[in-house]
UniProtKB/Swiss-Prot annotation:
<protein>
    <recommendedName>
        <fullName>Uncharacterized protein C7D4.14c</fullName>
    </recommendedName>
</protein>
<dbReference type="GO" id="GO:0033621">
    <property type="term" value="P:nuclear mRNA surveillance of meiosis-specific transcripts"/>
</dbReference>
<dbReference type="GO" id="GO:1902794">
    <property type="term" value="P:siRNA-independent facultative heterochromatin formation"/>
</dbReference>
<feature type="compositionally biased region" description="Low complexity">
    <location>
        <begin position="182"/>
        <end position="193"/>
    </location>
</feature>
<dbReference type="GO" id="GO:0000785">
    <property type="term" value="C:chromatin"/>
</dbReference>
<keyword id="KW-0597">Phosphoprotein</keyword>
<feature type="region of interest" description="Disordered">
    <location>
        <begin position="277"/>
        <end position="303"/>
    </location>
</feature>
<dbReference type="GO" id="GO:1990251">
    <property type="term" value="C:nuclear exosome focus"/>
</dbReference>
<dbReference type="GO" id="GO:0016604">
    <property type="term" value="C:nuclear body"/>
</dbReference>
<feature type="compositionally biased region" description="Polar residues">
    <location>
        <begin position="92"/>
        <end position="111"/>
    </location>
</feature>
<feature type="region of interest" description="Disordered">
    <location>
        <begin position="66"/>
        <end position="111"/>
    </location>
</feature>
<feature type="region of interest" description="Disordered">
    <location>
        <begin position="180"/>
        <end position="229"/>
    </location>
</feature>
<feature type="region of interest" description="Disordered">
    <location>
        <begin position="130"/>
        <end position="165"/>
    </location>
</feature>
<feature type="compositionally biased region" description="Low complexity">
    <location>
        <begin position="290"/>
        <end position="299"/>
    </location>
</feature>
<feature type="compositionally biased region" description="Polar residues">
    <location>
        <begin position="143"/>
        <end position="156"/>
    </location>
</feature>
<dbReference type="GO" id="GO:1990477">
    <property type="term" value="C:MTREC complex"/>
</dbReference>
<feature type="modified residue" description="Phosphoserine">
    <location>
        <position position="74"/>
    </location>
</feature>
Amino acid sequence: MDAVEPSVEKEYKKIISFRDTVFEGKHQQFLVPNNVRLKFLRDRLHKSLKNFDSVKRKVEIANDEGNNKLLKSSPKAQTRDENTPSEFKNGGFSNRESMSENCFSKSSTNLPRLDINRDFNSLLNSQTKPEATGLMKEDITPVVNTSKQSSTGTQEESSKPEKSNKLLAKSTLSLYGNQAFNPSSVLPSNSSSTPKENKKNVNKETYQPNTFRRSPLKNDTGSVELSNLYMPSPPSSALPVSLVSAPSPPRATNVAVPCLKHLESSEQGNNLLINKAFTSPRLPSPPQSTRPSSTRFPSVPLSDEKNSIVSVKNEEPSVILGNQSPISDLHPYSPSWIPYPKELQSLQVNRIPELSLENNVMSTRDYKDIMPHPRPSAVLLDKPVSLDQTSHPFPHQNTYILPPGIRNSVDYDGTFLSRKSLPPYNGIHRLHESPSQFSNQSRYNWEPILENRSLLHLNRPPPIETHYSYESNNSSFSPYYHKRHRQISPYYPTSSVYGVYESPPHMSDSRISRQHMPLTHTTYEPSAPYYNDYELAEEIERRRHHSFYDY
């Protein structure tokens, strides 16, 4: 590769180091004090004024000569000359070399409105040519305050300078701010009575405009303040140090979600121990003494803090599991709500409860001792069927005739001839009612939950769908829509309405006749596939979400 020029390499290094300092945030570590900043601006101003030093010297020498010759009798001029600081008389400022040479170009400054070189050059060019601006040479002469000024002169001469004087005053104001503006020193007199000898000393080279300010810049804050008005906002180095680079976003408040992570089983294993759970900000709980637990449970002492939920701030335990149930626990949206009944004393949080014996599939030989019932009717009877009186668990099984309007023969055995003997069926097809929130129904809204909370009453096959869904074969979305069986029967000729196994509602419905076992079977063989509780729950869930034929 070609070697990079050393100057370019230097520039690259500068850029890279600057970028690194910015990335590491080092440029924010420096505070620039106000006086340092003022000094920097002052030095920059001197730098831009440096070209004027030679011109200023000549003008001052000429002024001094003229003043000494013509105005020896004037005390004002002498006192003014004495008041002028020595650094101005000697020409140039004492600290004008403090800035390094190559920092800024000599012709201009970065500060807007302080680009004094350019302004003065334009003033020089315009005012040294009286024809261009209409200024007379009398107006260009440096001002000397004498007590002997006469007010004679023609009006034509004085009217033109007035406009230019206003212009001069405006430019001076904009250059130096209010502090710098001294009208007696800036504005030339309206009279043209200055002695003519003075005009001889003024040449184009030695001209110094009247706007030059004769007070030392060391005490000057006006020009700096003025430049600050026009400067952009200060760099981040001028701002106070912040430890964090960006302000952190507002924190969200803690919201408690009851979660198994917070639940730990205790050492004994039969008590539910909740060590710590997050509580959302709420009103502080009342002190222990005011709680009415002593009146409600006089014999039971207050539970120790181990069994209580403690918030992060270690405030007073707001939920006590042992003997009280605050209202917030009963409310299902409160942060401390526990989604299982507290009345169960020896509650263990198991995702999958263990199988008891009666929930398992039996062999045929012990069905007389414990009989799992495949029909809900036998389970929900007040007195279970005694197997001593009958040889078969469902003695009248296929001997009865269904009324023609009822398809749901699954719910019916020989023991029932009408729906009135059944408990209210809370099945899927009761669409007009929504289940009450705290009712004693199971989650899927089937039958009332039994005391042992088993799924035995779900052991029947689901009822036949009477309303066609979009997942059935009838819908045009079904893949089997065009491949239906065209059934031929004496009652219903070929019809395009019913799909596979979906025949009109009468007794010869293929599914109904298949589900009922003929009387010749003496062994207990359930006709529908028999599941244990877990398979059954799974199957029910699956059949609720998919159509019967979507295997």
